[in-house]
């Protein structure tokens, strides 16, 4: 078996399933566990990813208006790697290499088609289904991994709910333009007994009117340092809310085995009286 994973979350799933030795290629975004960095890179963005969130948003929109995709797949590298399995996704054409990108690469080079596993994580349930789907495609049992993750999440949620507090939380997955976090993030928030606010593209006035108790910034693909650099867009002092930054790249917007750590990050932020800050500085910080 020879696996090429073209999504960072799928690479984590592959390794959590004990299949890391079978992975032969990765995407430009696959960076965990660290050992995968030595694998051949099979993809790249077709736009400049440097710059602030407004500039990147504009470049992505311009690229989508004129090109088939915002990513390229190196079909020559794929051909050389001779994969038996390629893992991609159909959830978001902006977030990662998509199924259509892979199909174009396969049609250009391959006469014998590898198995293509397309993940679609729109919710917590989908994340667990994707783990099982990928495990089944590779001939292993994914249920023990799902059980371990779900057990950890239930324990975190039970501790949070025991506080009997329900803070009103605004999770932001992009800074400029402002976008409220959707998909599994509202579910994580509500698992802890909190209320999740504003899950769509929004304006600053919407934030002011919502009057959240807590704001959690988790820009898609951004680490703490890069998120910190994006905080200048808005006057956070206008809010009474406590404001926090998280590593959206490694945790919050990565739907893989570390989703339980994402829940833990939210729990440490929202219920500091009940959780030791074990991930502070690594996964989150106060603004």
Where are these regions (language model features)?
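N-terminal ligand-binding lobe of clamshell/alpha-beta domains
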Residues: 1-287
